Amino acid sequence: MKQYDYKTISRTMLGDLHTPVSTYLKVRDIFPQSALMESSDYHGSENNRSFIALCPLASVSIDHGTAIFRLPDDSREEHPITDAYRVENALNDFRARFRVEGEYSNYCGLYGYTSFNAVRYFENIPVKDSREATNDAPDMLYILYKYLIVFNDFKNEMLLLELSLIHISEPTRPY
């Protein structure tokens, strides 16, 4: 299993002239698979942040009983979801391949979604497994992004964050 090591490069800017939505509308066509996530907790404004994620580096998707890893070196791995290898095992195995260090590294996680149909992987509830020709979105999709724009409305700050690859390590094998 390869280990991907990244460091963060960051720049903080004044964010009072930009909103998350207006910024996202400007960049979404330039960066396919971009994402906008806004905080809906208006009670604790000190932790109220919005995120724009751009340029996927790697992803893990769960669909039709299979976990699919897409890695930064363009490799792809498939792992069947079973009673012995559950969704949480797949997510942990994927996440363990990445190490991020540097300032604001806590923002550099997996961003994505879990659909309602993913309940089949956690509860004994039958869900019809159908395939759509036009929109066959995975039950779960989580992406590690190269660029993040973090809006802190409480401080009127906008943080630009980049993940820079510093090392790919191969596993050591005993001889």
What positions do the PLM features span?
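Secondary-structure transition/turn motif
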Residues: 69-77, 161-165
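An N-terminal JmjN-like helical accessory module and its immediate linker preceding a catalytic domain
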Residues: 1-61
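Short, structured patches in soluble enzyme cores that scaffold and shape functional sites
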Residues: 39-41, 115-120, 144-147, 151-153, ...
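Short acidic (Asp/Glu) patches
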Residues: 84-101, 124-136
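Structural signature of FAD isoalloxazine-binding scaffolds in flavoprotein oxidoreductases
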Residues: 59-60, 131-154
